Amino acid sequence: MSDVYVLGVDMIKFGRFPDRTVPNIGAEAALMALDDAGLTIKDMQSMYCGNLGQANAMVGQRILQEIGQTGIPVVNCANACATGATAFREAWMSIKAGIYDVVLAVGVEQMGKGLLGGAGGGDGIPKEGLLGSGTMPCVFAEAGMEHSKDHGTTFE
């Protein structure tokens, strides 16, 4: 098994960018991380892209269209609030397993207005109708309460 090192990281400033596409935002972040590592997309053997809001839109491949298509495999990940972390984990595991030596992991999202944005039916649903539902804050809150009940975990 191989040691795994993070060679470069970066991120764009948080904000709303209605005039930009998700791949354009992701491409900027990817290029900044590659620059931080002193590498280019041509050095990469694979790419792992985390995006939930447009998970069916091949965001990773569209990022490569902007920064340079090299023929490398692209894995698109969607895993709710852990999407970016999942892309990083998959990239890390591919190196640890000895499949690749150098890969790129990128996470990108463009949030809509409100809790559910435009993807999940958000507008017009009162807060009271969302509580106790499958929204991710509720899921995590319920998991925390269950852990507290089973193991005596406290807020401290």
Per-region residue spans from a language model:
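Conserved "HGTGT" condensation-loop signature of ketosynthase/thiolase-family condensing enzymes
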Residues: 1-74, 108-156
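Short, high-confidence coil segments that cap the C-terminus of an alpha-helix
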Residues: 44, 99-103
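Alpha-helix C-terminal capping segments
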Residues: 66, 90-99
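Blade-loop segments of beta-propeller domains
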Residues: 77-80
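Short conserved active-site loop signatures built around small residues
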Residues: 84
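Short alpha-helical segments and helix-capping/turn motifs at coil-helix boundaries
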Residues: 87-92, 143-144
